[in-house]
Amino acid sequence: LEAKIFARTQSSFLSQALKYQPGVRVEDNCQNCGFSQVRINGLDGPYSQILVDSRPVYSALAGVYGLEQIPTNMIERIEVLRGGGSALFGSSAIAGVINVITKEPVASSASASHEIRGIGGLNAFENTTDLNATYVTDNNQIGLTLFGQLHHRSPYDHTGDGYSEMPK
């Protein structure tokens, strides 16, 4: 997956971009904590190895938590290797490998975005604000990229029983 696909599909995060890769499914598993997990060839998240710039993220939870914390405007491309890769990438790569190649900071820039989504019509809303800044020194020796996110979701009671299926 390349950056032009992120723009065409309006993907803001790694989890949204992965939905357009065949054989990869991103599922929202917990309405309380809001985590999503990636499934490659139907296997759960802990069976997938996540790499950032070809370096492994050593955690069985890497395929579960953090997929919403990598914005697509920091990603150059995503390489997905489906199938057993445990001989090359370790025991966490039974389902496959997702290699996130980040962009090199080449110019100072800043961006901000805000997204509002309705949940169940106009009964509840989900607000997400993202800030992204890149700083590069004049001699191009040092580059720094920062990302921040503020997320708020109002509770939503679909069944009307007084209990929220989607708490804050």
Roles of regions detected by a PLM:
Residues 15-59, 76-77:
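Extracytoplasmic beta-strand/coil segments of soluble accessory domains associated
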Residues 37, 77, 97, 128-132, ...:
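Membrane-embedded beta-strand positions in outer-membrane beta-barrel channels/transporters
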